[in-house]
Protein backbone atom coordinates (compact mmCIF):
# COMPACT_ATOMS: atom_id res chain seq x y z
CA UNK A 1 0.00 0.00 0.00
CA UNK A 2 1.34 3.45 -0.93
CA UNK A 3 2.07 6.13 1.67
CA UNK A 4 -0.89 8.31 0.54
CA UNK A 5 -3.20 5.29 0.83
CA UNK A 6 -1.86 4.44 4.29
CA UNK A 7 -2.34 8.03 5.38
CA UNK A 8 -5.94 8.09 4.11
CA UNK A 9 -6.64 4.83 5.92
CA UNK A 10 -5.22 6.28 9.16
CA UNK A 11 -7.28 9.47 8.87
CA UNK A 12 -10.43 7.40 8.33
CA UNK A 13 -9.59 5.31 11.40
CA UNK A 14 -9.12 8.43 13.52
CA UNK A 15 -12.42 9.85 12.31
CA UNK A 16 -14.22 6.61 13.13
CA UNK A 17 -12.76 6.65 16.65
CA UNK A 18 -13.73 10.13 17.77
CA UNK A 19 -11.40 12.62 16.09
CA UNK A 20 -14.09 14.70 14.40
CA UNK A 21 -12.54 18.19 14.29
CA UNK A 22 -11.71 18.93 10.66
CA UNK A 23 -8.75 21.24 11.45
CA UNK A 24 -7.16 18.54 13.62
CA UNK A 25 -7.59 15.86 10.96
CA UNK A 26 -6.18 18.25 8.35
CA UNK A 27 -3.15 19.01 10.53
CA UNK A 28 -2.45 15.31 11.06
CA UNK A 29 -2.81 14.69 7.34
CA UNK A 30 -0.27 17.46 6.58
CA UNK A 31 2.39 16.15 8.99
CA UNK A 32 4.45 13.26 7.52
CA UNK A 33 4.64 10.85 10.45
CA UNK A 34 7.25 8.80 8.59
CA UNK A 35 9.65 11.74 9.07
CA UNK A 36 9.39 11.29 12.86
CA UNK A 37 9.99 7.54 13.22
CA UNK A 38 13.32 5.73 12.98
CA UNK A 39 14.16 3.65 9.92
CA UNK A 40 13.40 0.22 11.45
CA UNK A 41 9.80 1.33 12.03
CA UNK A 42 9.20 3.34 8.85
CA UNK A 43 6.81 0.72 7.47
CA UNK A 44 4.61 1.27 10.57
CA UNK A 45 4.59 5.07 10.41
CA UNK A 46 0.93 5.25 9.38
CA UNK A 47 -0.30 2.49 11.64
CA UNK A 48 -2.37 3.57 14.63
CA UNK A 49 0.26 2.49 17.13
CA UNK A 50 2.91 3.99 19.41
CA UNK A 51 6.52 3.35 18.37
CA UNK A 52 9.87 3.59 20.22
CA UNK A 53 12.05 6.63 19.50
CA UNK A 54 14.95 6.11 21.92
CA UNK A 55 15.75 7.21 25.49
CA UNK A 56 12.92 4.99 26.71
CA UNK A 57 10.35 7.24 25.01
CA UNK A 58 7.75 6.66 22.30
CA UNK A 59 6.02 8.54 19.51
CA UNK A 60 2.39 8.51 20.59
CA UNK A 61 -0.37 6.55 18.92
CA UNK A 62 -1.96 8.81 16.26
CA UNK A 63 -5.41 8.38 17.80
CA UNK A 64 -4.14 9.71 21.12
CA UNK A 65 -2.44 12.63 19.35
CA UNK A 66 -5.70 13.41 17.57
CA UNK A 67 -7.91 13.17 20.64
CA UNK A 68 -5.59 15.19 22.89
CA UNK A 69 -5.11 17.87 20.24
CA UNK A 70 -8.86 18.03 19.68
CA UNK A 71 -9.41 18.41 23.43
CA UNK A 72 -7.25 21.55 23.43
CA UNK A 73 -9.70 23.33 21.08
CA UNK A 74 -6.91 25.32 19.41
CA UNK A 75 -7.05 28.36 17.17
CA UNK A 76 -4.40 30.32 15.30
CA UNK A 77 -4.13 32.98 18.04
CA UNK A 78 -3.09 30.60 20.81
CA UNK A 79 0.33 30.37 22.42
CA UNK A 80 0.87 26.76 23.48
CA UNK A 81 3.25 25.13 25.95
CA UNK A 82 4.12 21.50 25.23
CA UNK A 83 5.79 19.40 27.92
CA UNK A 84 7.72 16.57 26.27
CA UNK A 85 8.84 17.24 22.70
CA UNK A 86 9.83 13.63 22.08
CA UNK A 87 10.13 12.98 18.34
CA UNK A 88 8.54 16.34 17.54
CA UNK A 89 5.49 14.77 15.89
CA UNK A 90 2.91 16.14 18.31
CA UNK A 91 4.77 19.47 18.20
CA UNK A 92 4.39 19.59 14.42
CA UNK A 93 0.66 18.90 14.64
CA UNK A 94 0.24 21.70 17.20
CA UNK A 95 2.29 24.07 15.04
CA UNK A 96 -0.19 23.64 12.20
CA UNK A 97 -3.01 24.84 14.44
CA UNK A 98 -1.75 27.67 16.66
CA UNK A 99 0.33 30.86 16.67
CA UNK A 100 3.38 29.63 18.58
CA UNK A 101 4.49 26.43 20.32
CA UNK A 102 6.97 26.49 23.20
CA UNK A 103 8.16 22.93 23.70
CA UNK A 104 10.42 21.44 26.39
CA UNK A 105 12.32 18.13 26.27
CA UNK A 106 14.57 16.70 28.99
CA UNK A 107 16.54 14.41 26.63
CA UNK A 108 18.96 16.51 24.61
CA UNK A 109 19.47 13.88 21.90
CA UNK A 110 15.74 13.63 21.25
CA UNK A 111 15.38 17.40 21.19
CA UNK A 112 18.16 17.85 18.63
CA UNK A 113 16.58 15.25 16.36
CA UNK A 114 13.15 16.88 16.75
CA UNK A 115 14.60 20.32 15.97
CA UNK A 116 16.11 19.00 12.73
CA UNK A 117 12.79 17.47 11.66
CA UNK A 118 10.81 20.60 12.46
CA UNK A 119 13.31 22.75 10.56
CA UNK A 120 13.12 20.44 7.54
CA UNK A 121 9.33 20.91 7.54
CA UNK A 122 9.64 24.70 7.79
CA UNK A 123 8.02 24.79 11.24
CA UNK A 124 10.99 26.27 13.11
CA UNK A 125 9.49 29.76 12.82
CA UNK A 126 6.44 28.64 14.78
CA UNK A 127 8.20 26.42 17.33
CA UNK A 128 10.54 27.50 20.15
CA UNK A 129 12.45 24.67 21.83
CA UNK A 130 14.20 24.23 25.15
CA UNK A 131 16.14 21.42 26.78
CA UNK A 132 15.00 21.32 30.38
CA UNK A 133 12.77 19.99 33.13
CA UNK A 134 9.25 20.11 31.74
CA UNK A 135 7.74 19.93 35.19
CA UNK A 136 8.91 23.50 35.78
CA UNK A 137 7.22 24.79 32.65
CA UNK A 138 8.45 27.96 30.96
CA UNK A 139 7.54 30.74 33.41
CA UNK A 140 9.22 33.59 31.53
CA UNK A 141 6.89 32.96 28.56
CA UNK A 142 3.73 32.49 30.63
CA UNK A 143 0.81 32.77 30.53
CA UNK A 144 -0.13 30.21 27.89
CA UNK A 145 -3.62 29.85 26.44
CA UNK A 146 -3.07 26.12 26.08
CA UNK A 147 -0.77 23.56 27.73
CA UNK A 148 -0.28 19.98 26.55
CA UNK A 149 1.62 17.47 28.67
CA UNK A 150 2.77 14.27 26.96
CA UNK A 151 3.88 12.34 30.05
CA UNK A 152 1.76 11.11 32.94
CA UNK A 153 1.70 13.22 36.10
CA UNK A 154 0.61 11.78 39.43
CA UNK A 155 -1.67 14.79 39.88
CA UNK A 156 -2.42 18.06 38.12
CA UNK A 157 0.87 20.03 38.40
CA UNK A 158 0.35 23.29 40.29
CA UNK A 159 3.43 24.81 38.66
CA UNK A 160 1.87 24.37 35.23
CA UNK A 161 -1.55 25.56 36.34
CA UNK A 162 0.11 28.79 37.49
CA UNK A 163 1.39 29.28 33.93
CA UNK A 164 -2.03 28.72 32.35
CA UNK A 165 -3.94 31.84 31.35
CA UNK A 166 -7.33 32.54 32.90
CA UNK A 167 -9.76 30.90 30.50
CA UNK A 168 -6.98 28.59 29.31
CA UNK A 169 -7.02 24.83 28.86
CA UNK A 170 -4.48 22.18 29.85
CA UNK A 171 -4.70 18.58 28.63
CA UNK A 172 -2.58 15.90 30.28
CA UNK A 173 -2.48 12.24 31.29
CA UNK A 174 -2.82 11.67 35.04
CA UNK A 175 -2.04 8.47 36.92
CA UNK A 176 0.69 6.13 38.13
CA UNK A 177 3.08 4.49 35.68
CA UNK A 178 2.00 1.04 36.85
CA UNK A 179 -1.69 1.86 37.33
CA UNK A 180 -4.65 3.39 35.55
CA UNK A 181 -4.08 6.62 33.66
CA UNK A 182 -6.62 9.02 32.18
CA UNK A 183 -6.38 12.07 29.98
CA UNK A 184 -7.76 15.02 31.93
CA UNK A 185 -8.80 18.41 30.57
CA UNK A 186 -8.29 21.30 32.99
CA UNK A 187 -9.94 24.69 32.45
CA UNK A 188 -8.70 27.60 34.54
CA UNK A 189 -11.84 29.62 35.01
CA UNK A 190 -10.45 32.09 37.57
CA UNK A 191 -7.23 32.77 39.49
CA UNK A 192 -7.94 29.99 41.99
CA UNK A 193 -10.64 28.01 40.17
CA UNK A 194 -10.28 24.94 37.97
CA UNK A 195 -12.82 22.77 36.18
CA UNK A 196 -11.58 19.28 35.33
CA UNK A 197 -12.96 16.62 32.99
CA UNK A 198 -11.84 13.03 32.64
CA UNK A 199 -11.73 12.17 28.95
CA UNK A 200 -10.34 8.70 28.15
CA UNK A 201 -7.87 6.04 29.39
CA UNK A 202 -4.29 6.08 28.12
CA UNK A 203 -0.81 4.71 28.80
CA UNK A 204 2.07 7.22 28.91
CA UNK A 205 5.59 7.25 30.28
CA UNK A 206 5.78 9.13 33.61
CA UNK A 207 6.51 12.84 33.96
CA UNK A 208 9.98 12.81 35.53
CA UNK A 209 11.56 15.60 37.56
CA UNK A 210 14.95 16.97 36.60
CA UNK A 211 17.29 16.12 33.74
CA UNK A 212 18.94 12.78 32.92
CA UNK A 213 22.62 12.40 33.93
CA UNK A 214 24.95 13.78 31.27
CA UNK A 215 26.55 10.35 30.80
CA UNK A 216 23.17 8.65 30.30
CA UNK A 217 22.32 7.42 26.78
CA UNK A 218 20.57 10.18 24.85
CA UNK A 219 21.42 12.91 27.38
Swiss-Prot record:
**Which keywords, in A-to-Z order, does the entry hold?**
Cytoplasm, Methyltransferase, S-adenosyl-L-methionine, Transferase
UniProt protein name: Protein-L-isoaspartate O-methyltransferase
* Statement: the UniProt record of this protein carries the keyword Methyltransferase: yes
Entry similarity comment: Belongs to the methyltransferase superfamily. L-isoaspartyl/D-aspartyl protein methyltransferase family.
Q: Which reaction does it catalyse?
A: [protein]-L-isoaspartate + S-adenosyl-L-methionine = [protein]-L-isoaspartate alpha-methyl ester + S-adenosyl-L-homocysteine
Q: Which InterPro entries does the record cross-reference, listed alphabetically?
A: PCMT, SAM-dependent_MTases_sf
Predominant location: cytoplasm
According to its UniProt entry, the function of this protein is described as: Catalyzes the methyl esterification of L-isoaspartyl residues in peptides and proteins that result from spontaneous decomposition of normal L-aspartyl and L-asparaginyl residues. It plays a role in the repair and/or degradation of damaged proteins.
The entry's active site is 60
An example Gene Ontology biological process: protein modification process
Amino acid sequence: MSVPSRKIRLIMELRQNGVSATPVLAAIERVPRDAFVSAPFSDQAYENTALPIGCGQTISQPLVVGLMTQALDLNDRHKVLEIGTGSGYQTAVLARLCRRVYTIERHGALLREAEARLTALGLHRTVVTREGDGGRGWPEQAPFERILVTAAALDIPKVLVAQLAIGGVMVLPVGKESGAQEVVRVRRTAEDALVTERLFPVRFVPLVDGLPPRDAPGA
